[in-house]
Amino acid sequence: MKRSELDIVLKELTEQIYNLLGDKLEKVVLYGSYARGDNTEESDVDVLVLTNMEPEENRKILWTLNKIFSRVGLEHDILLSMFLLDKKAFHARKPILPFYQNIEKDGVVVYAA
């Protein structure tokens, strides 16, 4: 997928996430191979959805967010992978987990409150 096509997908995805969460949406971050620019035809699109909600609230919206990701992915014939997390947990784990550090280092912010 070309970057211009990916930008369209990410814009549509972010709009739908924002419509669901409103001001509870903190950030949408593209990470992984598409963010680094080393994606292949088989690569999925990794997206972090960072909220300012409690973990219990995140669990309640997980199913709806999965539906949004699936629908947008099917419409554009691309596999979208979602990682949903609250910002407190992300910042608490970032100093000790390389995965979180890589998102911080390589991630491309698509939306920030």
Residue ranges and their predicted role:
Residues 45-50:
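Short beta-strand->loop micro-motif that forms the acidic, two-metal-ion catalytic signature
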Residues 33:
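Recognition helix of helix-turn-helix/homeodomain-like DNA-binding domains
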Residues 1-26, 36-41, 52-113:
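Catalytic core of pol beta-like nucleotidyltransferases
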